């Protein structure tokens, strides 16, 4: 099974109109589910709850630890989904309303908003919007606690080999936005991640 983004869903009921809530229940569920995610050697990125009438969808986003590269495999998504479903089914503080459980991993196009996101993207080409500075296109060479080092790549005419500049270190607090650029060498990987971010699989 290739490393890629995946989504698994456990269907409990049907829904009509959809709304999103942000409340302490999400924090409670994150604390409840995190040990099982860590036991699966994954990182719990986010837990969100979407409500449609009396029905809920619990969306859990998991990722690999920051020192690893690649994507979360479909097998890993399926395994952790089963464990999380069991925990939710036996949650003593649950109000008993029906729910769907959706477990997914971040897509390659997610914004790089935390240091761990930059660690996960090591070696990738990124486009960076710098506060009070020029926008940069470069490859991530290394990531520290407070900054990222890029090897700039200067865009040239079509058909010409890109020119690399000297490494430059940018503090995270000077980065307004960062995003991975899709390269031809990563097209297959990106296509798999996009594919598995689509319709859910039954758990």
Curated annotation (Swiss-Prot):
Species: Paenarthrobacter aurescens (strain TC1)
SUPFAM superfamilies: YhbC-like, C-terminal domain (SSF74942), YhbC-like, N-terminal domain (SSF75420)
Main location: cytoplasm
Ranges of Polar residues composition bias in the record: 1-21
Signal peptide annotation: none
Region (Disordered): 1-23
Protein name as annotated: Ribosome maturation factor RimP
InterPro entries: Ribosome_maturation_RimP (IPR003728), RimP_C (IPR028998), RimP_C_sf (IPR036847), RimP_N (IPR028989), RimP_N_sf (IPR035956)
Gene3D superfamilies the UniProt entry points to: RimP-like superfamily, N-terminal
